[in-house]
UniProtKB/Swiss-Prot annotation:
Keywords: Antimicrobial, Bacteriolytic enzyme, Disulfide bond, Glycosidase, Hydrolase, Signal. Lysozymes have primarily a bacteriolytic function; those in tissues and body fluids are associated with the monocyte-macrophage system and enhance the activity of immunoagents. PANTHER family: LYSOZYME C. This is Lysozyme C. Lysozyme C is capable of both hydrolysis and transglycosylation; it also shows a slight esterase activity. It acts rapidly on both peptide-substituted and unsubstituted peptidoglycan, and slowly on chitin oligosaccharides. The keyword DNA repair does not apply. It comes from the Eukaryota. It is an enzyme of class 3 (hydrolase). Residues 19-148 form the C-type lysozyme domain. Its EC number is 3.2.1.17. Disulfide bonds join 24-146, 48-134, 83-99, 95-113. Monomer. Residues 1-18 form the signal peptide.
Amino acid sequence: MKAVIILGLVLLSVTVQGKIFERCELARTLKRLGLDGYRGISLANWVCLAKWESGYNTQATNYNPGDQSTDYGIFQINSHYWCNNGKTPGAVNACHISCNALLQDNIADAVTCAKRVVRDPQGIRAWVAWRNHCQNRDVSQYVQGCGV
């Protein structure tokens, strides 16, 4: 019985952690997926955005109690506007995607949705972390030494 309890505690302590990209690995992946220069946004800005939104973690989520929405994945894409989690009141789902798809280690769906986000008038300014940490700053460090 004691062994079962210990095993249960061990299993409870295991957290699901998605892929956490290395900076240059992410830069190369985003370039391959067509984000470098997309809508005039440099690759360095995309990598900066991902750093400050999720710490490059594909499984990152953040609940927003105000509107009962959740931000998902490497770009922290919001369930109120962009994806469907089946829980957010009045969700729009402009990317026509399940929010869970934004948590995959393969970030192709997240990139496709991010491209949809920046086609809106706010562009990359839709992300608060980009405005706070990347906008009007030298972001070249985010791709420096990556060969991209």
